[in-house]
């Protein structure tokens, strides 16, 4: 992207699509006020808390209760900002990709999400803070898809094709 090449990216997994949507397809402006607003939100008992935090009674310990709630608040806040027209699509994907990237730094895992640790490790105890991913300047004509490659391949073309199929059973 930074070298000016046109890039076409596809991933069937939504989290990866979101990251690529920002890193490959995006050059959005974000204000300090938007980040301050999201980081100042009070915790909400949402999806992450209910499914990945011990305090919810789900039996999992992937995030502290506080960080899970904070992640949920920011995720809900992003939807509100988008639906109210306060951020556009490029800003939405930038902030959502930054949330996905940020929350991983606070995960109570040994590095993969196959299992959580019994005790809360030191990095997972830190208070969650949304940190922005870098903006990679470059060509604005890149394409990012979230589709089955078997269908997409008939609608796109390029000079080089790199496929990275799933390689494990998880």
Question: What does each model-found stretch correspond to?
Answer:
Residues 1-5:
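Conserved SAM-binding loop of SAM-dependent methyltransferases across substrates and taxa
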Residues 151-157:
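Short conserved loop adjoining the S-adenosyl-L-methionine
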Residues 154, 166-170:
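Short acidic, Gly/Ser-rich segments with clustered Asp/Glu that frequently serve as metal-coordination loops
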Residues 148:
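Conserved acidic residues
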Residues 159-161:
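Structural motif
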Residues 9-10, 164:
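Short hydrophobic/aromatic-enriched beta-strand-loop microsegments
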Residues 6, 12-137, 169-170:
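Class I S-adenosyl-L-methionine-dependent methyltransferase module
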């Amino acid at each position: 992207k930074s070298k000016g090449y046109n890039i076409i990216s596809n991933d069937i997994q939504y989290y990866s699509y979101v990251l690529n949507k920002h890193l490959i397809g995006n050059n959005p402006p974000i204000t300090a006020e938007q980040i301050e607003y999201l980081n100042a939100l009070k915790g909400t008992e949402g999806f992450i808390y209910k499914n990945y935090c011990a305090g919810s009674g789900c039996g999992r310990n992937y995030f502290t209760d506080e960080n899970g709630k904070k992640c949920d608040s920011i995720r809900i806040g992003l939807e509100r900002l988008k639906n109210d027209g306060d951020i556009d699509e490029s800003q939405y994907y930038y902030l959502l990709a930054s949330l996905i990237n940020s929350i991983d730094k606070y995960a109570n895992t040994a590095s993969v999400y196959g299992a959580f640790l019994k005790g809360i490790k030191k990095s997972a105890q830190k208070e969650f803070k949304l940190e922005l991913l870098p903006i990679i300047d470059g060509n604005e004509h890149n394409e990012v898809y979230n589709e089955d490659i078997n269908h997409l391949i008939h609608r796109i073309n390029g000079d080089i094709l790199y496929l990275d199929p799933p390689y494990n059973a998880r």
